[in-house]
């Protein structure tokens, strides 16, 4: 077998491969022998069909089977011998496949780029340091109390955290518009569900009042005919309800688990959960900065085939998340996922090189600690640890996560790292 490799464009390669006629002829003979033992033809016993009948009826399909075997086998033998790191599947083109002649074909495929890391010392990472305060815990308790809140009808004016029941009719230039009318609409004030100015126009009014609100639809509003338009809403305020928060008693805190018997227990449990969430958020924030720095310092081309595979993964994930079927998934435009898919392939290649160049292997003790941390969120942590330890697929997933963390640490060791004091809210609610 001889071959010739050429670069067509970017990461695309074309290999011309010649398979000697002796190998081809032998493969064809062996396939005919196998067929002769197994084919069934009316009028002949199995294994006794004449060769010319087999040739007439099955010759073309037998040769196609031989071709289907020879092409990938000799292609992969060639790329292994040449140590070519292929991406995706090759496309074959037959140049010669005739009796008594060499098999000549080409394979077009992509290769993964050669990655040589550089500029790690130029990567800048801001590492937040956060202390969870008693005030942070108080805020979390307030959230829990609001989740358990009841509502009491009020005759006072509307305040920012009330619940109101209203009728409204919206109009633009005196004409009502589709979707601008509702009856007995329940609105939780202060949540920003309505367009700017709507909630603010209700604050200060009393139940039973009728009044108008003048607002302007945002320029980016989803309805094309309303973008940037001035509108008037006629409001009938039917009912106002004040939020009534439950008292912080032992009875209240008992709702949050069998081991939570007092306010002190609840605060301790909240702190533990906040610490776990904070730790994960900090790891994620630092990792994203490392990823951004790696990509910025090491711009690389990625194989189209690898990106397409990742697009399919993202499509399927989107379908699972939103309940779509396979047909609907296939119709989702690739442009929705292309940027993220490209980034994922880049990150995978760069992290692989970090792991390779630093000769990293997953730290088993670190993996055990990660499982213990995951298990701590469950009521029976020992059972969770045992479940992980007996499931090799889950263990490998954990090892891969640990290996990525070790790769991040390896980059941080060379990067410019600065610490910044931050609050819990700044890390957990960066958009707030």
Curated annotation (Swiss-Prot):
Cell compartment(s), UniProt: Cytoplasm
Pfam families in UniProt: FKBP_C (PF00254), Trigger_C (PF05698), Trigger_N (PF05697)
PROSITE patterns in the record: FKBP_PPIASE
UniProtKB keywords: Cell cycle, Cell division, Chaperone, Cytoplasm, Isomerase, Rotamase
Source superkingdom: Bacteria
Molecular-function GO terms, alphabetical: peptidyl-prolyl cis-trans isomerase activity; protein folding chaperone; ribosome binding
Domain annotation PPIase FKBP-type: ranges: 161-246
Record field: catalytic activity: [protein]-peptidylproline (omega=180) = [protein]-peptidylproline (omega=0)
EC number of this enzyme: 5.2.1.8
Transmembrane feature ranges: none
GO-annotated biological processes: 'de novo' cotranslational protein folding; cell division; chaperone-mediated protein folding; protein transport; protein unfolding
GO terms under cellular component: cytoplasm
Main location per the UniProt record: cytoplasm
Disulfide pairings: none
Function: Involved in protein export. Acts as a chaperone by maintaining the newly synthesized protein in an open conformation. Functions as a peptidyl-prolyl cis-trans isomerase.
Protein family per UniProt: Belongs to the FKBP-type PPIase family. Tig subfamily.
Comment on protein domains: Consists of 3 domains; the N-terminus binds the ribosome, the middle domain has PPIase activity, while the C-terminus has intrinsic chaperone activity on its own.
HAMAP family: Trigger_factor_Tig (MF_00303)
Name this protein carries in UniProt: Trigger factor
Organism per entry: Haemophilus influenzae (strain ATCC 51907 / DSM 11121 / KW20 / Rd)
Gene for this chain: tig
């Amino acid at each position: 077998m001889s071959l010739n490799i050429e670069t067509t464009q970017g990461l695309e390669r074309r290999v011309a491969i010649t398979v000697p006629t002796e190998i081809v002829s032998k493969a064809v003979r062996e396939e005919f022998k196998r067929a002769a033992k197994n084919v069934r033809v009316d009028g002949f016993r199995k294994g006794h069909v004449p060769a010319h009948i087999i040739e007439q009826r099955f010759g073309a399909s037998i040769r196609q089977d031989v071709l289907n075997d020879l092409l990938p086998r000799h292609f992969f033998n060639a790329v292994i011998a040449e140590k070519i790191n292929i991406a995706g599947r090759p496309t074959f083109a037959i140049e010669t496949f005739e009796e008594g002649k060499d098999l000549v074909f080409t394979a077009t495929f992509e290769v993964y780029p050669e990655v040589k890391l550089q500029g790690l010392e130029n990567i800048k990472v801001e590492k937040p340091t956060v202390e969870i305060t008693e005030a942070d815990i108080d805020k979390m308790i307030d959230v829990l109390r609001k989740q358990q809140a009841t509502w009491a009808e009020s005759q006072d004016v509307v305040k920012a955290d009330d619940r109101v029941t209203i009728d409204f009719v919206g109009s633009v230039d005196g004409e009502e518009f589709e979707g601008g009318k509702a009856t007995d609409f329940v609105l939780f004030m202060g949540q920003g569900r309505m367009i700017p100015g709507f909630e603010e126009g209700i604050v200060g009014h009393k139940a039973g009042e009728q009044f108008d609100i003048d607002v302007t639809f945002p320029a980016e509003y989803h309805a094309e005919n309303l973008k940037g338009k001035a509108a008037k809403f006629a409001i009938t305020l039917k009912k106002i309800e004040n939020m009534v928060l439950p008292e912080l008693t032992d009875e209240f805190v008992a709702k949050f688990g069998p081991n939570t018997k007092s306010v002190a227990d609840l605060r301790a449990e909240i702190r533990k959960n906040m610490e776990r969430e904070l730790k994960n958020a900090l790891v994620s924030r630092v990792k994203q900065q490392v990823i951004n720095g790696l990509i910025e310092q090491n711009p690389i081309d990625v194989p189209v085939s690898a990106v397409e595979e990742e697009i399919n993964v993202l499509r399927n994930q989107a379908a699972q998340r939103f309940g779509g079927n396979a047909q609907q998934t296939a119709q989702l435009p690739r442009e929705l996922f292309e940027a993220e898919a490209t980034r994922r392939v880049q990150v995978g290649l760069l992290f692989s090189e970090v792991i390779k160049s630093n000769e990293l292997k997953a730290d088993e003790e670190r993996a055990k600690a990660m499982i213990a941390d995951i298990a701590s969120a469950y009521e029976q942590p020992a059972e969770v640890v045992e479940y992980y330890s007996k499931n090799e697929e889950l263990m490998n997933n954990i090892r891969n996560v640990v290996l990525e963390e070790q790769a991040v640490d390896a980059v941080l060791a060379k990067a410019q790292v600065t610490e910044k004091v931050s609050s819990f809210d700044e890390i957990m609610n960066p958009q707030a």
